[in-house]
């Protein structure tokens, strides 16, 4: 019925807009550093293009692991190829993006279909079906309202890296803005690291349970742009992407593992951006209703940009944000409940696309902090090198970070772009 209702209103819509790409927020520079897409190859009536990368990734941990058997250092083969076909009339598009990571010692791996969709575009509307990634949010330090896709914690402990999500989605353009409708028929549980990997929770996470979730998750989103401001608001009804972790005990009463427990939710959320000269004001907030509780989460702050730093070509942005979260202790913990973030982003604007980003989040109630720093640079048109550091400090009182007290790490990645 949801899809039928969408199709019934398609005839009175405007330009299309389902791309699955971020709006407003800045992705990690490690993920964004790549050469321009290659020119598409002609295939009769349409065009075929391929992109992506493969490479080597090393993870270095300065501290010994908290759990026996975990890696001290890791070396991985990583690959993310993407191929897309666009018809001659540019109405049809088929896109496939795969991802794989394989450890060289010890031997284990993970793989996922990030995208595998067909999209049809008209001048006044578009329709998409298949696996896709959709990003919602505006802030830098935390993407609290991003809910369509499930998190892949094997790649990023904070949950910013997402699994592909099966969906049917339609975009309509009206005179006052844009409407998006989503039907998400298959729920995907959160992907947790294997027992050898780091960083991970001290207890292994196995299995999962979904409590009385709807057969199909649904979402509707509205986007309005006026002058220098952008506003997005959505309603989501479905299974919570953040599980409760229920301990399982042995015969002696000692916890031996955690089982994720997923509950149905209703969530209302919004994000906003407003440009004021060289200042960018941005924020996002949600109100979540579960069978057991109602709570809110919000992030808001400012970004101030400086162009042509010291008379050169470099641009720098200074960032400051505040994080708020009042969820109860029974829910998946937030990294910061009353936190502040300060950071910077540097674009050198040289021929090798050198970029850097660094920031610190401090949580006042737990006195914990997280530091992140990224740097990336193209060595040639096809090869790129990146460094990413994640550090945890004074996390003993943090529900979200206490298990990572010995898991600060540096990631070095060498990529060959396709």
PLM features per residue range, with description:
Residues 6-68:
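N-terminal periplasmic/intermembrane-space "pro-region" immediately following the signal or transit peptide
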Residues 35-50, 84-93, 121-128, 176-178, ...:
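Short loop/turn motifs that connect adjacent beta-strands in outer-membrane beta-barrel proteins
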Residues 54-64, 93-104, 114, 151, ...:
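Transmembrane beta-strand segments that form the barrel wall of outer-membrane beta-barrel proteins
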Residues 69-77, 109-114, 162-166, 214-218, ...:
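Residues that define the transmembrane beta-barrel architecture of outer-membrane proteins
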Residues 83-87, 119-122, 131, 171-174, ...:
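Residue-level signature of outer-membrane beta-barrel architecture
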Residues 84-197, 227, 394:
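Outer membrane beta-barrel
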Residues 276-363:
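Detector for outer-membrane/organellar transmembrane beta-barrel domains
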Residues 302, 404-418:
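Outer-membrane beta-barrel "beta-signal"
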